[in-house]
Amino acid sequence: MKRGWIPIMGVCLVLSFSACKQLLPYQDASLTAEQRAEDLLPRLTLEEKVSIMQNASPAIPRLGIKEYEWWNEALHGVGRAGLATVFPQSIGMGASFNDSLLYEVFNATSDEARVKSRIFGESGVLKRYQGLTFWTPNVNIFRDPRWGRGQETYGEDPYLTGQMGMAVVRGLQGPEDAGYDKLHACAKHFAVHSGPEWNRHSFDAENIDPRDLWETYLPAFKDLVQKAHVKEVMCAYN
């Protein structure tokens, strides 16, 4: 009689282990990113939500979430992550007035980025400059040549900046009907962040003329969000 119970117990153990391995909705790769996020967010405590609101997001072991470093750069090619194809600075690419060319540049950049991230990910943890979230493009308006980061922009023209910025986003993120994003682009810095750099943490931009704000500084961000569907937006420091 005792021997007869052994196979039954074995089957029960297999079934129980299978139940334990059943994926929760946020772990199910067959669901959309939106569905998985909607399932995951209510499972996070307030403290856990706060902890991941920074570029160095810690792991949440109880939910099987690994630590993640959001900071990565691709201003004119994959940056700070070993060998990569280096393209001209943004101000130079902007001078081409060729948004189709810019799309191809950042389509190639996102290809390299995915390969690099895949290799880096073999270690188990993606460190800074190894993930798939890139803080590019910079769609601020370059009005003052004394601003030390003007070379990151596409110049002083709001329309050109919007066109170039959208090409960058589409090249980095890939086709919207692909079912997944190649990576995430980030529109920065929202908004009126065009210098001075030395006092950026205290500079008061509230004295800007409302017409100048809406006609000069905001159109590119509107283009990237509403037309190119950029996945991230970085706030300004002012």
Spans of features found by a protein language model:
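Bacterial Sec-dependent N-terminal signal peptides
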Residues: 1-24
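Glycoside hydrolase catalytic-domain context in secreted enzymes
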Residues: 20-238
